[in-house]
Amino acid sequence: TLPAIGLAERHGLQEQSAVVIRKLAAATVGRLQIVYQLFRVLTGILGVRLNGHPPFVRPLIFPMSVGAGEATFGAPSAEEVPEEVIEEIKAANAASENYGNFYGQNLSLVQPGILLVFGVMTGLGYTVSVWNLVMFAIPIATISVVLGAIQFLLLDRRYRGKAATTR
C-alpha cells in the first residue's frame, strides 16, 4: 500500500483533499474528526482493515483537517496556521483513528481481539459466547464516540476563540 500512497501524494492527493474541505463551510477540524471516528467504528464492525495512520490518516485525513483549520483561521495556506494548532490537529487525527479503530474492532465477530478474549475466557472455564462479548462492547463503543465527539467539539470551540482573537 505504501507505493500506492506515494504515487497518490505525488499527484496531489493531499492538496486536493484540503481544497475540497476548505470549500465546505460546515467542515471544521472537530466535525471532521467525529465523522472519521464514526467511519472507523463502521469499518471495524465490518472487519475492514485500513492499516491505520501511515496509509490513511497521514495522506488523507490530516490534509483535510489542516484544510478545515485553514478555513477556521482564515489562513490562505497551511503555513499561516499556527504551529501549535497543526500539532493539535495531528493529535486529534491520531485520537479519532485510535478511538474508532480500537472500539470498532470490538463490535465485530471476525476481529482477532474479540476472538482472543473469547478464547481466553473459554480456556479459563467461563461459559461465554462471542455474541455476548460483542453486546457488552456496544455501550463502551457508544461511550467512546460520545466522549470523542465532546472532545472534538471542545477543540472546535477553542479554535473559534483563537481565530477570533487573531483576526
What label would you give each PLM region?
Residues R49, H53, M121-R167:
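Juxtamembrane and boundary regions of transmembrane helices in multi-pass small-molecule transporters
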Residues T1-F62:
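Membrane-embedded alpha-helical segments and adjacent helix-loop junctions characteristic
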